[in-house]
């Protein structure tokens, strides 16, 4: 019994240690997770902080621009309370390479200060100033349809991740790129209009859109990355563009209802 108890204690201590260490750069570098109030973060060489976790149960949160004297410049895919409905980004965050709020099922509004140097919001939806890309659509918004504003250049990585209320999304002629996982797991999405301005559809852009039954891809699209329509189990009809030369791996993987696909003569591999 004593040996078993000692083993359990050692295991518990090891678990505590591991939960306070993260790995960066492909697992080659250890970073200690630091705690400041309701937030956990790691430090970078320049002294800036990367926010990892929010421990608060509050429904509305204003994220800090400083933690223990360190400027918060990066927000990772943070673990929030499932009750989060509104979040405000600090002015210190200069960029987001993907939507960090995909795990917030009740989130309805994302806010930034009017003078924020890098982002702006329209009706609670987050956009990047430098290129007018749509960065994050709150997955708790109850609207069934959404028209992306004219002037938007791209739908960013995971921008509509897990937005289960949306049945229809229309994209303006200004959009040129649909990024990786842009509409991933939009389980109610039935219709999406892709304008002839789009030239690239990213990896897994529409994967697990299980209600999507048909898709027409315009001739402007020259690249569709792997798995873009994987797990679209209701998809029955696809029209591929004449500009396409290659069908990427797993493009229609597990599309169990697919019965009609038009492959143009331009496709050689």
Predicted features, each with a name:
Residues 1-9:
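Bacterial N-terminal signal peptides that target proteins for export
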Residues 8-20:
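Bacterial N-terminal signal peptides
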Residues 18-31:
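Sec-dependent signal peptide cleavage junction
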Residues 77-78, 159:
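A short, well-ordered alpha-helical element
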């Amino acid at each position: 019994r004593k040996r078993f108890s000692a083993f359990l204690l050692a295991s518990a201590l090891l678990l505590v240690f591991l939960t306070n260490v993260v790995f960066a750069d492909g697992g080659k570098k250890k970073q200690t997770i630091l705690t400041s109030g309701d937030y956990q973060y790691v430090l970078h060489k320049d002294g800036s902080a990367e926010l990892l976790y929010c421990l608060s149960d509050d429904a509305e949160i204003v994220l800090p621009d400083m933690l223990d004297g360190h400027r918060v410049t990066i927000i990772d895919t943070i673990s929030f309370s499932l009750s989060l409905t509104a979040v405000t980004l600090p002015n210190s965050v200069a960029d987001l390479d993907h939507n960090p709020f995909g795990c917030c099922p009740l989130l309805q509004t994302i806010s930034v200060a009017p003078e924020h140097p890098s982002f702006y919001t329209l009706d609670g939806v987050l956009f990047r100033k430098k290129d007018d890309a749509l960065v994050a659509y709150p997955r708790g918004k109850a609207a069934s349809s959404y028209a992306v504003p004219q002037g938007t250049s791209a739908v960013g990585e995971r921008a509509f991740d897990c937005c289960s209320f949306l049945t229809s999304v229309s994209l303006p002629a200004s959009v040129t790129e649909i990024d990786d996982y842009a509409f991933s797991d939009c389980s109610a999405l039935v219709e999406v209009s892709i304008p002839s301005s789009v030239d690239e559809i990213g990896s897994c852009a529409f994967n697990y859109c299980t209600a999507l039954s048909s898709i027409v891809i315009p001739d402007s699209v020259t690249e569709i990355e792997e798995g873009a329509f994987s797990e679209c189990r209701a998809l029955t009809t696809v029209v591929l563009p004449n500009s396409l030369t290659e069908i990427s791996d797993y493009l229609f993987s597990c599309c169990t209802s697919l019965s009609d696909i038009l492959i143009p003569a331009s496709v050689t591999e």
